[in-house]
């Protein structure tokens, strides 16, 4: 299983100079609000995917009165430790290095460092638009389907070109020129998503029993165009409206994965607390499927766990992480609110300084 063997963070948010050796399984960071606990988790997340889960403004990640931040880890990949690090300056320039080499794509870091992140906003999975749910499915496919990323990249290129042609109101031949490529990759992407949903559903049901046994939610996958037509037929039917609107209305870029309870949208029935529990079940099912398909468990980042769940559900989270054999980074205010297993390390965070206890 991959795990982070060392973590160094410099000038990231309020973390001036952090150098710690995490445990290969459980790591709990405690301290008062604003101490820097969430920033530890955020730095790991940034290194994996190249963005923050808290802000869309990367300039805010650089510590005040400094001009750059640095995040560096050694990552155990099952056979050896490899170095992985990123530096970003105030001008927006950034450099990602993996095993001593400059990486050409952030997907290389994401592949080596698979993460599942859970935070106070996790319940937005049900409330936000389809994009966040597509990303959830695509994360799984990225890690379990070798062909996914190249298909997804080609689809994005052809979709971008078709939308540009629609917006510019180019001749029909220049617009439909992109249809064949879009359809080929769109149908392939749909099939991959459909397959992964089929494998995911029973695992989600299994995990949901741990958190909300009285709520048998059902996951429904919508491919992004009518079941009555092929994608090519749908593009032809929609062409006039696409021209009016300046973008492609149908296709896998409109797919969704919705949860229902007794044929009603889950978000219309469940409380906010229950929605958070559903999100936990989703992400643990995600980790379980990844482990079944690849033998690899993701690293979990769980922000403010005690505030999110009651004692029984917190124990359930600990047991599931233990079952998955995942490394986990958990934050909270009071360490006594977590039943930490023997194989764990406790870190105190105060004013941006982190110390192992």
Curated annotation (Swiss-Prot):
ATP binds at residues 31-38. InterPro entries: DNA-binding_RecF (IPR001238), DNA-binding_RecF_CS (IPR018078), P-loop_NTPase (IPR027417), RecF/RecN/SMC_N (IPR003395), RecF_2 (IPR042174). Pfam families: SMC_N (PF02463). Keywords: ATP-binding, Cytoplasm, DNA damage, DNA repair, DNA replication, DNA-binding, Nucleotide-binding, SOS response. The RecF protein is involved in DNA metabolism; it is required for DNA replication and normal SOS inducibility. RecF binds preferentially to single-stranded, linear DNA. It also seems to bind ATP. It comes from Coxiella burnetii (strain Dugway 5J108-111). The keyword rRNA processing does not apply. GO terms for cellular component: cytoplasm. GO terms for biological process: DNA replication; DNA synthesis involved in DNA repair; double-strand break repair; SOS response. Belongs to the RecF family. This is DNA replication and repair protein RecF. PANTHER family: DNA REPLICATION AND REPAIR PROTEIN RECF (PTHR32182:SF0). GO terms for molecular function: ATP binding; single-stranded DNA binding. It is found in: Cytoplasm.
